[in-house]
Swiss-Prot record:
InterPro entries: Ribosomal_uS4, Ribosomal_uS4_bac-type, Ribosomal_uS4_CS, Ribosomal_uS4_N, S4_RNA-bd, S4_RNA-bd_sf
Domain of life: Eukaryota
Compartments (UniProt record): Plastid, Chloroplast
Name by which UniProt lists this protein: Small ribosomal subunit protein uS4c
Length: 207
């Protein structure tokens, strides 16, 4: 399944706030549809979701927030299961340590998709070398920065959006547009509202 390239607010209406997907706020609090919110028996009561639907929704939150394909997510679930600890928390840690997510969390881009473009176009340096693979996984003590010849471009980009940095595991130098990964991300620092256990349960018979 390829990455979604359609209307972002449509996804937000269906899944809820996705900070990595868009900064725009959704003014409608019901899922997208031709006739507005669904009603049961003509009243305001919502139709109860099945357990499968609830798990699917949590899985889709991860996919759309981090901008990854179904195949990539399944691969990350497999990797998380191999490591010691809570599979769900390790899965989130892997996704948050992707280079595109780190660039977004540093406030160098308004969305993860925008961060991916910066990386693809060669604007990002990791440990002294240009890296153009957004899915590269960062490690503790990695040094990440904007390339010297890209500094003005990124500084101009920063003026086009509002970003509040909330990543205590990253040591940031805003003036030099650089940072060091000081620790693995703690669970409470993940900005996405997600029940990762339901995602693991969704894939329990698939991987």
């Amino acid at each position: 399944m390829a990455r979604y390239r359609g209307p972002k607010l449509r996804i937000v209406r269906r899944l809820g706030e996705l900070p990595g997907l868009t900064q725009k706020n959704c003014t409608r609090d019901f899922p997208p549809g031709q006739h507005g919110p669904k009603k049961k028996g003509g009243g305001n009561q919502k139709t109860k979701e099945s357990q499968y639907a609830v798990r699917l929704k949590e899985k889709q939150k991860l996919r759309f927030n981090y901008g990854i394909s179904e195949r990539q997510l399944m691969s990350y679930v497999r990797e998380a299961r191999k490591r010691k600890g809570s599979t769900g928390e390790i899965l989130l840690q892997i996704l948050e340590m992707r280079l595109d997510t780190i660039i977004f969390r540093l406030g160098f881009a308004p969305t993860i998709a925008a961060a991916r473009q910066l990386i693809n176009h060669g604007h990002i340096v990791v440990n002294g070398r240009r890296v153009d693979i957004p899915s590269s996984l960062c490690k503790v003590n990695d040094s990440i920065s904007v390339a010297l010849n890209s500094q003005n471009f990124v500084k101009n980009l920063l003026q086009s959006f509002t970003k509040t940095l909330d990543a205590p595991y990253l040591e940031v130098n805003q003036e030099k547009l650089s940072a060091v990964v000081r620790d693995n991300i703690p669970r409470e620092a993940v900005s996405l509202q997600i029940n990762e256990l339901l995602v693991v349960e969704f894939y329990s018979r698939k991987v």
